[in-house]
Amino acid sequence: MVTKQFSGSPDEADLRRADSLAREIFSDVANKWALLIIETLGDRTLRFSEVLKDIDGISHKMLTQNLRMLERNGLVERTVYPTVPPRVEYTLTEPGQGLRGTVHLMCDWTQQHLGHIEEARGRFSG
């Protein structure tokens, strides 16, 4: 795995700064739809309709916006095949695969602590 060294200022890499590039990227990818898209793609290459079908509750518009954002940030690769009608496929890039590991750990954490969180919510509401 080849990681490119960030050449910007330390301020740009500081998540705590509201105007930093790191905060902008974090804000982009740390939303429920982006995380679910990353988990859904996994190590597969899928067409738009397959991703849409696999993620319950996501709208066509939200999937489009999030795939574009993930592509813009270099986490998803979009391939268009010159067929009629055009065939478009999506796959995670190397950095996207790296983030997938973190997303997968978050999914595992959620499953592991569901009971505890459900109980805490009950106490909070009750």
Task: Identify the residue ranges that each predicted region occupies.
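Long, low-complexity, charged/polar intrinsically disordered regions in eukaryotic proteins
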Residues: M1-D11
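N-terminal helix-turn-helix DNA-binding core of bacterial DNA-binding proteins
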Residues: L15-M62, E89, Q97
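Alpha-helical linker/hinge and terminal dimerization helices associated
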Residues: L35, N73, T102-I117
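Alpha-helical residues within the helix-turn-helix
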Residues: K53, E71-R72
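Residues within the DNA-recognition helix of helix-turn-helix
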Residues: N66
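Basic, amphipathic "hinge/linker" alpha-helix immediately C-terminal to the N-terminal HTH DNA-binding motif
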Residues: P82-M106
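Exposed, interaction-prone assembly regions rather than primary DNA-binding/catalytic cores
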Residues: E119-G126
